[in-house]
UniProtKB/Swiss-Prot annotation:
Disulfide bond sites: none
Subunit details: Part of the 50S ribosomal subunit; part of the 5S rRNA/L5/L18/L25 subcomplex. Contacts the 5S and 23S rRNAs.
UniProt-recorded Gene Ontology molecular function terms: 5S rRNA binding; structural constituent of ribosome
NCBIfam families documented for this protein: L18_bact (TIGR00060)
Name the UniProt record assigns to this protein: Large ribosomal subunit protein uL18
InterPro entries, sorted: Ribosomal_uL18_bac-type (IPR004389), Ribosomal_uL18_bac/euk (IPR005484)
Domain of life of the native organism: Bacteria
Keywords from the UniProt entry: Ribonucleoprotein, Ribosomal protein, RNA-binding, rRNA-binding
Species for this entry: Shouchella clausii (strain KSM-K16)
Length: 120
């Protein structure tokens, strides 16, 4: 019997493998990314204290997006989370791509965050 491999299960396995070594600190939090077919979410996480320090997504009313599943929306989310992080006093983060390939919407979000002043 031929079965189709589950892409999301593979992504979760890759993410778990990376998360064993990757961790955010209060001085250098983790910029976590989650992508769905319609939206993209980004948040700064302090893993030591288990606290979310800043977040942004395509669902934010501040962005006023009609379509949240494209590269332009991902770049705007990256710029917004970067702006919120810089306003909160963070300039350096650890980028956690969530097991996704660094391509397309993930790369655009990262570029937007870099433009806003984050370093990673």
């Amino acid at each position: 019997m031929i079965t189709k491999p589950n892409k999301n299960a593979g992504r979760k396995k890759r993410h778990a493998h990376v998360r064993r070594t990757l961790s955010g600190t209060p001085q250098r939090p983790r910029l976590n990314v989650f992508r769905s077919s319609k939206h993209i979410y980004a948040q700064l996480i302090d893993d030591v204290n288990g606290v979310t320090l800043a977040q942004a997504s395509t669902l934010d009313k501040e962005l006023g997006l009609e379509n949240g599943g494209n590269k332009e929306a991902a770049r705007k989310v990256g710029e917004l989370v970067g702006k919120r992080a810089v306003d909160a006093g963070f300039e350096s983060v650890v980028f956690d791509r969530g097991g996704y390939l660094y391509h397309g919407r993930i790369a655009e979000l990262a570029d937007g965050a870099r433009e806003a002043g984050l370093k990673f």
